[in-house]
């Protein structure tokens, strides 16, 4: 499905927003039946020290066999997997909600809203890593 074919009810900008907070609100709204597009996924952030975050993602990448489980490396796919983890994905309702969510690197839409209480400004500490940096360290091809 191309950018033009997805008619989103809501376009959310994830730039400098905390991944988990945005993902939980996206999941909740998708369950309510809204069609949601999230833009600038590569600029969303994960809080914590860079070493700790990268250790978690590297362990995830090393565990398993050639047959799986496989984990995403691209920022948009990491974001989408986070949203999926917050949905009852194995039920019909959850799967339909998941189909109504699109995640984009960059911004193919004219305007986007920023969700309340998801901004990086609310942090008392300054330790965070962007999804783009995580993806680069995992070996993703940098196209953003």
From Swiss-Prot:
Family: Belongs to the universal ribosomal protein uL13 family.
UniProt organism field: Natronomonas pharaonis (strain ATCC 35678 / DSM 2160 / CIP 103997 / JCM 8858 / NBRC 14720 / NCIMB 2260 / Gabara)
Gene Ontology molecular-function annotations: mRNA binding; structural constituent of ribosome
GO cellular component: cytosolic large ribosomal subunit
Domain of life assignment: Archaea
Protein's name in the database: Large ribosomal subunit protein uL13
GO biological process: negative regulation of translation; translation
Disulfides per UniProt: none
InterPro entries with a match to the protein in the record: Ribosomal_uL13 (IPR005822), Ribosomal_uL13_bac-type (IPR005823), Ribosomal_uL13_CS (IPR023563), Ribosomal_uL13_euk/arc (IPR005755), Ribosomal_uL13_sf (IPR036899)
Function: This protein is one of the early assembly proteins of the 50S ribosomal subunit, although it is not seen to bind rRNA by itself. It is important during the early stages of 50S assembly.
